[in-house]
């Protein structure tokens, strides 16, 4: 069989996707005797004019960065006594720089953290508890205003360390032009997104074509982009978990996980509606109109909107298994441990403002964590964001475990081995489980 013209791409589009597999300096902090934040001065800057200076770090280098700058600008105008200095650091180096700043001083007063990283950082006691601010703000501003899953992600143990800014779930992007050409339409003649696996497979088969007659498909019904989030979504729909309830053992070789991985393999080799993980860039192929469907995060919306001539829409992820599930994550707003009381209160004011103002954030391609804002007409008018937001009741995050960031580099090669047809799901996940367990057993 000749190589496919498509390949999977796990590259992160600048400013949209986020890098998880970065080397962490937290182990170095531990070797040096624990987090040094308490020994240094965080959040103590004051401008010559008497203003409180807040340093705010994030990794928003794309269109989301422009939206954040606008939100911060609005805060500055409404709070002339607070000077916010925003620094944008590419995600590829962001966590290394943040780690060093938290350990040795100079940490920002407010910083963005992905939900999956909070347990890791707080396991080294680097974050400031925010419980007193939530207590002072309740009941007008608190748990009832947020979606349950991102709200829970702000806790480590019994204490709360963050404000959830958004939720970025995976969903289905589909090419409306190819759908209409294949006759996959509703009563109004509009492209009809699949809701079930049967509908999904039927649509994928109709759109997989050899348009130039060379014996190989050059138009595909579906393509895997980020294998990790695709697998987590499908596995979640089969009721799978990555770790045992106590977080001490891997459950990657459970029947539910294996069924999900087998289904992904079958889409390539049995149903032949998706390309093998090799060839050209899979996400680029979707952007260029050569693929009918892709499961991707809401954070990729901007790259589609920038693509001239692409007719697309968004929908919830089809239900491949017996239950609804969709992978997701969140950007959280945090403060460093050891921040002064004055700066902590000013930082909280900024954090609350960004949450309150997150309809601007939504327009940049995110789903607000705030339930009241998602009900607003301005958000309802954002068609793709609104469609993806319908999944929040069953969105599933990666394990909120201190070692989550360390275990996924051990899992992803197994997923790819199955997709390349060089390992069975059982063999690949058995080996991945062994490697993950070795990490979990370490102190």
Task: Place the predicted regions along the sequence by residue.
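Extracytoplasmic/periplasmic solute-binding protein
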Residues: 41-42, 156-165, 170, 180, ...
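Short, polar/charged alpha-helical segment
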Residues: 61-83, 177-178, 411, 429
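Hinge/lid segment of periplasmic solute-binding proteins
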Residues: 115-171, 198-201, 224, 234, ...
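Glycine-centered hinge/linker elements that transmit conformational signals in sensory
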Residues: 201-208, 246-276
């Amino acid at each position: 069989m000749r190589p496919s013209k498509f390949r999977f791409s796990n590259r992160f589009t600048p400013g949209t996707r986020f890098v998880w597999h970065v080397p962490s300096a937290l182990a170095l902090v531990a070797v040096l005797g624990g987090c040094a934040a308490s020994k240094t001065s965080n959040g103590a800057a004051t401008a010559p004019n008497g203003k409180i200076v807040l340093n705010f770090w994030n990794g928003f280098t794309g269109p989301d960065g422009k939206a954040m700058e606008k939100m911060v600008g609005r805060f500055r105008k409404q709070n002339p006594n607070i000077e916010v200095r925003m620094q944008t650091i590419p995600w590829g180096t962001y966590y290394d720089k943040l780690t060093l700043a938290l350990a040795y001083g100079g940490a920002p007063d407010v910083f963005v953290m992905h939900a999956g990283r909070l347990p890791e950082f707080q396991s080294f006691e680097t974050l400031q508890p925010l419980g007193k601010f939530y207590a002072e703000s309740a009941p007008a501003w608190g748990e009832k205003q947020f979606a349950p899953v991102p709200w829970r992600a702000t806790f480590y143990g019994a204490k709360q360390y963050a404000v959830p800014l958004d939720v970025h779930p995976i969903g289905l992007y589909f090419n409306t032009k190819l759908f209409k050409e294949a006759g996959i339409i509703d009563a109004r003649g509009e492209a009809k997104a699949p809701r079930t696996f049967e509908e999904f497979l039927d649509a994928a088969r109709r759109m997989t074509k050899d348009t130039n007659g060379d014996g190989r498909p050059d138009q595909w019904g579906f393509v895997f982009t980020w294998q990790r989030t695709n697998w987590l979504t499908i596995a979640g729909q089969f009721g799978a978990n990555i770790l045992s309830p106590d977080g001490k053992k891997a459950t990657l070789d459970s029947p539910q996980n294996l069924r999900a991985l087998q289904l992904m393999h079958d889409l390539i080799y049995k149903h032949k509606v998706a390309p093998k993980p090799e060839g050209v860039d899979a996400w680029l192929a979707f952007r260029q109109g050569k693929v009918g469907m892709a499961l991707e995060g809401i954070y990729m919306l901007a790259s589609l909107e920038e693509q001239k001539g692409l007719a697309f829409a968004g929908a919830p992820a089809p239900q491949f298994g017996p239950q609804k599930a969709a992978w997701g994550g969140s950007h959280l707003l945090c403060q460093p441990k050891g921040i002064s009381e004055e700066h902590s209160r000013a930082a909280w004011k900024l954090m609350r403002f960004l949450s309150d103002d997150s309809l601007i954030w939504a327009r940049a391609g995110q789903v607000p964590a705030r339930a009241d804002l998602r009900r607003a007409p301005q958000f309802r008018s954002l068609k793709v964001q609104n469609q993806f937001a319908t999944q929040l009741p069953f969105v599933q995050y990666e394990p909120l475990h201190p070692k989550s960031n360390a275990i996924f580099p051990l899992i992803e090669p197994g997923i790819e081995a199955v997709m390349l047809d060089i390992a069975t799901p059982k063999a690949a996940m058995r080996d991945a489980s062994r490697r993950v367990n070795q990490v979990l057993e370490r102190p």
